[in-house]
Each structure stands twice: as C-alpha cells, then as structure tokens.
Amino acid sequence: MKKQLGFLIIALFFVHTLFADLTINIIQGVNKPYPIAVVPFGNDVKNAWQVPNGVSGIIAQDLTNSGRFANLPVSQMPATPTDVINFNWQQWNNANTGIEYAVVGNITPGTVPNTYTVTFSLLSLLSNQPLIGQQFSNVPRDQLRLLGHQISDVIYQTITGKPGYFRTRLAYVEVFNSTTAKGTWELVVSDYDGFNPHVLLKQSAEPIASPNWSPDGSTLAYVSYINNRQAIFTISLTTGQRHIIANFPGTNSAPAFSPDGQSMAMALSGSDTTDASDIYVMNLKTRQLTRYTDFGSNTSPNWSPDGKTLVFNSDRGGSPQIYSLDLASKSATRLSYTGVNNYDPVFTPDGKNLIIMTQQTAGGPIQLASLNLASNAINIITSGQLDKSPSVAPNGDMIVYANYDSAHGILAETTLDGTVQIKLPATDGTVQSPAWSPFLN
C-alpha cells in the first residue's frame, strides 16, 4: 500500500525550544503486554537530536512507553530482516522468543533532495502473515520523528483496536522561582513524550494556570492576570495571538472549551455578595453568559463528550465533592460519596468514567481515582502523596497529571487502571497543570 505522508508544520511565534527534554521511566507495566520485535530498519537515519536511535528506535520507544508492548532486545533477535520477502518465518518461530508480532522496514533516499522514502510492515507470528504494509514518500529529515510516531499509531491501532496517541501533544505550565521577585511562568507545548518542548508564552510576576485545548487543537485557553485580577485568555498555537475571553469583576478561572468549540465553561466569582464562584457557560461568538449554579462555591467544570452535561466540584454539601449538571434542565446531581474530598473531574472519552482527585481520609494523600458513572464506585489509580490536575489522552488509554512528591512538581502518566506508571521528570522548574491535546491532523 502506497501512502503519501502529508505534514502539518506548526509555526510557534515568540517561542524558543527548551534545551532539556523530559524523560520517561516506566515504573510498572501491564501483566500481559503484547510481545513484539521492532527490527532495526535498513539504512535507518539517525540524528542525535531528532532520532538518536533511528525511526525504528522511535517506534520501539513509543510502544514501550504505552506499557502495552514488551519489546524484544535486538541482541535476542534471530535475524534482522528489513522486509517481508527476507523474513524467515520458520527461523523466528523456532527461536522460542515468545514474539507474537514483528515490525520490519527500510529507508531509501526520496525522489526529492534531502528526503527519504520509508517502508514498513507489521507481521503476525500468530498467523504467519503480514497484517499491514505502508510506504511514505519524500519525507523531510526533520519530520522523521513525526513519521515514527505515525507508524506507532498504525501499529497500536492494528493490534489493540484503539487509535494511537503518539502524535498528540501536551500543554503544561513550568514555574521557576515562584516565591521570589524573579519568578517566571511558562506555557509550554511538547510532544506526548515530552520531546520537542516549545515555550508558547513566558511571563514574569504574572502566574499562568489551567491550560485547556480547543477541540481542533489550534488554540489554548488559560488563566493569567490583568491588573492583579485573574482573567481568562486564549492563545493561538500558529500565530501566538492572544485574546481576552473573560475579565469580569472578581475571579475568572477554570476555562473549558465545549466539544464543538462554540462555547466555554468557566468559574466566575464576584457576581453576588458571597464572592463564591459559580459555573457559567459563554457563547464564544456572542460572548453571552449563562449562569448554571447559585449555591456554594463551584469550580473546575468539564464537559461530557456529547456536550450535554458538565461535571464540576462544589462545597455545597460541606466539603468539595463531584457533581453533574444537566445543561438543559440546570439540575445538579451529586456523584461522589466516598472520601473526605473529591476534586477536578474530567470525563474519559467514552463518557463512562470520570477521573478525579480524591482524598479518602482526613490528612491523607491526594491521589487520582476513576469514578464509574454507572455505579458511582471510586477506584484509586495512583499512589503519590499529592497527585493533581488529571487530563485524559484522546483515546482514553492514558492519563497525564502533576505529581508533587518531590521538591519540584513533575509530570506523570498512568493508565486508567493504574497498571502502567510513567514519570516525566522536570528538568528545571516545577511542572504543573498538564492538558492532553485532542487528536491532531
């Protein structure tokens, strides 16, 4: 199968690339990962910055990062074929490696100068036949890493049945010297694995918080300050242009784009004498506001996938708990009953679960948990002392969050059942408020 690879190159204005990348360490994996051999590609192109271990190395790392694949070391491979024709099925089956899948590929010069043609095949040793084969023509050298992620997505979906997330991105805030007059806040966008981080916005003395992706991945909403008052902004990833969305008296916080991108939920305070925050929805075209709560302090709204419901946390019952809000009727229903405090709900893409922050005992750790919407059962996912700001990958397989067990906050990732734990250590400042992008074209 021939396939021309189309690339979207996003130009980030007024940004610079960080010199130190986040690194990933898997500290726990699933019990039965898929055994796979990613055979080194023929004539693989290696570059110390972009693809230090070649395109095949990117694929192997992606699959390992997911925790759902067990990669066979090259030293244990019975051979290193680069295409299906030279793959000796009997030799691999007799090697007793336990491998169920193999990936082979080859790279040749493209027909356009300084480009490459990349072919790969995914083979099943369960059925002794190829599952998929693709060719990508005239790939620029600086896009080989992206191509590796694209191939990983294909392999992931073919084997697991779910879309891969390796071409998605993370937005987060990195904070330096926040307790001093020289404190700076940076709004950063990186690849899903922390590689290729770019600073989209840098500010001194004006904190940045709560980044939230538009559904098309072109824009981030975030919270910062105007004249010492919290306000909600948007910033374009292609132009760097910023817009003020909400700068009402009181505080303006917790922005959340609706699934169709036409509205934004937010928490606003100062609308009455109590100064308690309430949930509002703004029509982004007309800027019309609709208020949905009026009792207790309410914040952290998040949309259901169908856009008909908001979940949020409220202290109306005496302690922070999770509630759902039907937008048509404006009626709210409490969802969480287990634990002392529950915060920051986010939907999984299938709409069946919420990922929340939970504190099960007074003075106990704050960890991530899943809340099943059918049973209201809560299942603890993480084991940190302070785990915050969960955000779910668009395929629903992974969660990114901020972990504060060390002196500096770091990013971490986990599966929904907690069987895969990945830490992405910060290289310098404290990392906080991660947000996982939607699928990107």
Describe the function of each predicted region:
Residues 22-23, 84-154:
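Amphipathic beta-strand/beta-sheet edge segments enriched in Tyr/Trp
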Residues 163, 175-186, 203-205, 223-232, ...:
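A flexible loop/linker signature enriched in serine peptidases of the S9 family
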Residues 412-441:
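Blade-level signature of beta-propeller repeat domains, shared across WD40, Kelch, NHL, RCC1
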Residues 164-166, 215-216, 259-260, 305-306, ...:
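Residue-level detector of Asp-centered blade-edge/turn motifs that repeat once per structural unit
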Residues 170, 217-220, 261-264, 307-311, ...:
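Hydrophobic beta-strand positions that form the internal "hydrophobic ladder"
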